[in-house]
């Protein structure tokens, strides 16, 4: 096919070291060796879900209201805190400063009103789904004793580093997190973590 033909056109220009990396990358997915500590992942999933439920109960509102910008703004106003605003860099018009990186939103997390703090904390919990979805994907990947397939795209980024695949990028698991700790090496081997945070600096 065309892809196969292109490969052989490029073959002589690809260093042997890169061919070995391509081979290793493919083998990590097609011939996996790592396993998953399923009880540990299940415990982490329950912790994630439980944290959201607790935050919702403390806020005294619903997930639907927290996820809606207009309804969340109304909740803040009702609690005596005007909804923080910013100028949107995309439109140049006023918009709610509800992104977790917005300084004004960060202020809500330390607000003097316990109600306002509870609302802000609950919104953060409800909007953050990565921990929960990753735990579910780990459980799916490791069920029935299956090995953990690691799908990375060789030279997937414009800087030629690997990019994540399979909706489960194992390159950016939370440091010290339970999901990272749930990955187990075969007997006689260990999992070694390498920090690539400055690889493109």
Predicted regions mapped to residue ranges:
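Conserved "right-hand" nucleotidyltransferase catalytic core of DNA-directed polymerases
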Residues: 1-178, 184-190, 196-201
């Amino acid at each position: 096919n065309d892809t196969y033909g292109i490969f052989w056109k490029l073959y002589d220009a690809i260093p042997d070291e890169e061919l070995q990396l391509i081979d290793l990358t493919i083998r990590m997915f097609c011939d996996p060796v790592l396993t998953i500590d399923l009880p540990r992942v299940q415990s982490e999933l329950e912790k994630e879900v439980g944290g959201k439920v607790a935050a919702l109960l403390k806020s005294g509102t619903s997930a639907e209201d927290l996820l809606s910008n207009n309804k969340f703004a109304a909740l803040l106003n009702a609690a005596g805190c005007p909804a923080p605003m910013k100028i949107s860099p995309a439109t140049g018009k006023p918009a709610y400063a509800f992104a977790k990186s917005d300084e004004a939103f960060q202020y809500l997390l330390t607000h003097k009103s316990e109600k306002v703090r509870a609302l802000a904390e609950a919104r953060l919990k409800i909007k953050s789904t990565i921990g929960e979805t990753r735990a579910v994907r780990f459980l799916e990947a490791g069920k029935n004793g299956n090995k953990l397939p690691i799908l990375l795209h060789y030279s997937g980024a414009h800087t030629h580093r690997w990019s994540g695949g399979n909706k489960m990028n194992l390159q950016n698991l939370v440091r010290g997190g339970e999901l990272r700790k749930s990955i187990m090496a075969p007997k006689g081997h260990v999992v070694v973590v390498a920090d690539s945070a400055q690889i493109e600096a």
